């Protein structure tokens, strides 16, 4: 017998607008004893059917909606349909940019809550981030094997958010051959990037910054470029290819810097124009300021400063500080590419922080372009939380 979850009075409005989350406080009563991740029927206070979703007893997000169709069951064929729909939405992008790596599934924005899948050549890398995704693991994997029989499937569910769902972290091979230590992908019509699927950040690489790396390349010609929080050097590769006279890549990770150097070599770029600094970015930028160093272009792509609302005020201070330092280091007519990857940081707030940083640095500044996540990271219209990556191209006059 299926479980039915009744909502509090007037708490169905978000579902009527097709938002995929229901929080614990919106629930009136539960008829049945669902397992973690089990699909349940969601009804309003009068019993009118609204949606079918996954039960997450350990999360504040108590329900994640799978479907708004009452006759649609959550089985292997359901996942086949969702995956086919996701793949179809990316075909034009793959063809236009000659991609060998892309995000196949962007969780809620692809109507598959808690599931992220990236494809690197013939390797599918999955993150199962919710109780519902875990509960339907077998059906999801069966659907992937049916649609992508020649691809290996590797799991990278080693993320802290699983703890909020009462799930342990997990990584390892699910199907096929273990990915090699180095997987070389191509993007934007020929740029090569070395990816560490088993040990790299996220699923191995930041595919969401693909378009913005290309933008960086377009501004780099004849500029001295400082690439902060460089990770494996993607922005630096594009800057060198775009004609930068010097690129300084900065990260705290020695292994990331080695991979950044390798990525420059893969693309046959002139390493005499590149430096790789193992440093704390905040500390190094202050040292540069004291020494009077100047740059023509700075890229700020920091890690997420705010994981929850309680951390947002501190995150604002961090973004303000790092952007202030950047403005102080830029030559006249310098270009700043600055990003926030926190979903809690609105575009308006981020722009205000950058504006305040320019003001405190005594610089006139203009926004030339706004940047966001690449098109294989879509944002479902009822789900604004899917919009997480914000970026600005700023001219410091």
Curated annotation (Swiss-Prot):
Q: Which GO terms describe its cellular component?
A: cytoplasm
Enzyme class, UniProt record, top EC level = transferase
Where, if anywhere, are coiled coils annotated?
A: none
Give the UniProt subcellular location, in the record's own words: Cytoplasm
Extract one GO molecular function annotation from the record: RNA binding
Question: Carries keyword NAD?
Answer: no
Instruction: Give the keywords, sorted.
Output: Cytoplasm, Methyltransferase, RNA-binding, rRNA processing, S-adenosyl-L-methionine, Transferase
| Domain of life of the native organism | Bacteria
Q: Which Pfam families match?
A: Methyltrans_SAM (PF10672), PUA_3 (PF17785)
EC no.?
Answer: 2.1.1.191
- Which reactions fall under this protein's catalytic activity? cytidine(1962) in 23S rRNA + S-adenosyl-L-methionine = 5-methylcytidine(1962) in 23S rRNA + S-adenosyl-L-homocysteine + H(+)
- InterPro entries, alphabetized: PUA, PUA-like_sf, PUA_sf, RLMI, RlmI-like_PUA, SAM-dep_methyl-trfase, SAM-dependent_MTases_sf
Please tell me where this protein is predominantly located: cytoplasm
Q: Which cysteines are joined by disulfide bonds?
A: none
Looking at the record, the residues that make up the PUA domain are 2-81
Mind telling me which PANTHER family this protein's record contains?
A: RIBOSOMAL RNA LARGE SUBUNIT METHYLTRANSFERASE, S-ADENOSYLMETHIONINE-DEPENDENT METHYLTRANSFERASE DOMAIN-CONTAINING PROTEIN
This molecule's function is given as: Specifically methylates the cytosine at position 1962 (m5C1962) of 23S rRNA.
Q: Which family does it belong to?
A: Belongs to the methyltransferase superfamily. RlmI family.
Q: Under what name is this protein listed?
A: Ribosomal RNA large subunit methyltransferase I
State which gene encodes it: rlmI
